[in-house]
């Protein structure tokens, strides 16, 4: 069983190799807008899970996730060969590709935080003109007890 530091180093190296191979070696137009975001390795260093995101050709255009997944699936053998050549280990890990959902999750979390900030601002505006209920000084003191001390 390999240590976690070696697995992390190998995952980082695989991320770099796959990203540069997609950019330079793989001639598939469907992979133009694919970004490799992360790679995780199993403890035995036999499997690597490659996470990727896809952006659209423009800001308004939606990304074509299915086409990118199909292109990565078709290029998996070539990518594994390139990783094996550049990695220099006895066993080349099996590469599986998974869409990275972190950007969507972070956008959702940002929307929730924005909604909470707006609600806090509304409450602060309501609080500005508010007066406490009841007496101004709820702790009444008798004049006798003050003079006795």
Swiss-Prot record:
Pfam families: RBFA. Residues 124-149 are annotated as: Disordered. The keyword Cytoplasm applies. Transmembrane segments: none annotated. GO terms for molecular function: ribosomal small subunit binding. Keywords: Cytoplasm, Ribosome biogenesis. InterPro entries: KH_dom-like_a/b (IPR015946), RbfA (IPR000238), RbfA_dom_sf (IPR023799), Ribosome-bd_factorA_CS (IPR020053). The keyword Cytoplasm applies. It is found in: Cytoplasm. GO terms for cellular component: cytosol. GO terms for biological process: maturation of SSU-rRNA. Its main location: cytoplasm. Monomer. Binds 30S ribosomal subunits, but not 50S ribosomal subunits or 70S ribosomes. PANTHER family: RIBOSOME-BINDING FACTOR A, CHLOROPLASTIC-RELATED (PTHR33515:SF1). NCBIfam families: rbfA (TIGR00082). Belongs to the RbfA family. One of several proteins that assist in the late maturation steps of the functional core of the 30S ribosomal subunit. Associates with free 30S ribosomal subunits (but not with 30S subunits that are part of 70S ribosomes or polysomes). Required for efficient processing of 16S rRNA. May interact with the 5'-terminal helix region of 16S rRNA. This is Ribosome-binding factor A. It comes from Corynebacterium glutamicum (strain R). The lineage of its organism: Bacteria, Bacillati, Actinomycetota, Actinomycetes, Mycobacteriales.
């Amino acid at each position: 069983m390999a240590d976690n530091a070696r697995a992390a180093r190998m995952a980082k190296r695989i991320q770099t190799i796959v990203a540069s191979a997609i950019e330079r070696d793989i001639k598939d137009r469907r992979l133009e807008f694919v970004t490799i975001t992360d790679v995780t390795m199993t403890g035995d260093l036999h499997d690597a899970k490659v996470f990727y995101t896809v952006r659209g050709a423009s800001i308004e255009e939606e990304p074509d996730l299915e086409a990118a997944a199909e292109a990565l699936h078709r290029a998996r053998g070539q990518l594994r060969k390139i990783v094996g050549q550049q990695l220099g280990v006895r066993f080349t890990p099996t590469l599986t590709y998974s869409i990275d959902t972190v950007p969507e999750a972070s956008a959702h979390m940002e929307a929730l935080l924005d909604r909470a900030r707006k609600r806090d601002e509304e409450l602060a505006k309501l609080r500005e003109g508010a007066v406490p209920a009841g007496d101004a000084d709820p702790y009444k003191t008798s004049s006798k007890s003050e003079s006795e001390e």
